Curated annotation (Swiss-Prot):
Belongs to the pectinesterase family. This is Pectinesterase. Glycans are attached at residues 58, 124, 230, 303. Transmembrane segments: none annotated. May play a role in pollen germination and/or tube growth. GO terms for biological process: cell wall modification; pectin catabolic process.
Amino acid sequence: MVKLLNSTRELSINALSMLNSFGDMVAQATGLNRKLLTTDSSDATARRLLQISNAKPNATVALDGSGQYKTIKEALDAVPKKNTEPFIIFIKAGVYKEYIDIPKSMTNVVLIGEGPTKTKITGNKSVKDGPSTFHTTTVGVNGANFVAKNIGFENTAGPEKEQAVALRVSADKAIIYNCQIDGYQDTLYVHTYRQFYRDCTITGTVDFIFGNGEAVLQNCKVIVRKPAQNQSCMVTAQGRTEPIQKGAIVLQNCEIKPDTDYFSLSPPSKTYLGRPWKEYSRTIIMQSYIDKFIEPEGWAPWNITNFGRDTSYYAEYQNRGPGAALDKRITWKGFQKGFTGEAAQKFTAGVYINNDENWLQKANVPYEAGMMKV
């Protein structure tokens, strides 16, 4: 399926250079320091990308009317059909109360804000209100080669409202950079296809990073919020249904920590790294900081059953922090006790999602292909 989509989904190097240049302009305007990480600093393509300048947004959105559009939806309506180059939408600071759905036919959309806490897209739909989890999302992305930078995505439904998605990504080669993704249960839906998250903050309570995409999160802050009373928290809930599927959630050099008011509940909540949403659930946490609030077992069963215990795939490698000790971890068959550096390498961004296409290098975002120096 991926090969069939490549011809319509591949961004040109020149177009991505425009994206990089404009991204640098926004970073300078917001005071963000952008550090480039590539596999080869002498790479000729990277040098050419850095030389392109003077990119301008195709559309500007501002609540106060100072842009071409007042809503993000209006700007998206201006994206040409069968778009083959980045269509850059600059969204000025403000709280945008909109529900956004970028269709599969709308490819190469680039959303750039003025900061992850300054430009915010917010909603509050939840399954308690009637829609399915898939349709609770504040922002849903289906078009390939999507990029978001310096934006906040939010679902404010609250811990009692059950599933309520802030951002759903169902697009191949999606990049989310320096964004804040806030919610409670089911905050970030890494639904399907290849996706890369860098320098983001994701907050939530139950299963708040979930789905069956090929998702790599690098240098992200994963913050567990105060849940509802008597509610246990689960960082991940990966959804692989067959062993041949490529889906996995990979956290590399991330920080897993509690929010400031997490411990205010009495009795205190229990938090786990994840649980098997589907039978062949697969999650790898490596080179990350795990705080002491994570239960020693590390991983939890699905609703106190044996579901997925033998067929899931949970691995931890080179983690640090008081919650990273492996001596009391679960003894399920699905827990990879002898997980090696060679096995971990297969889930690095350069191997797992970038492979021979080098789409991450072409996008010129901060990116580490292999194991990181931590």
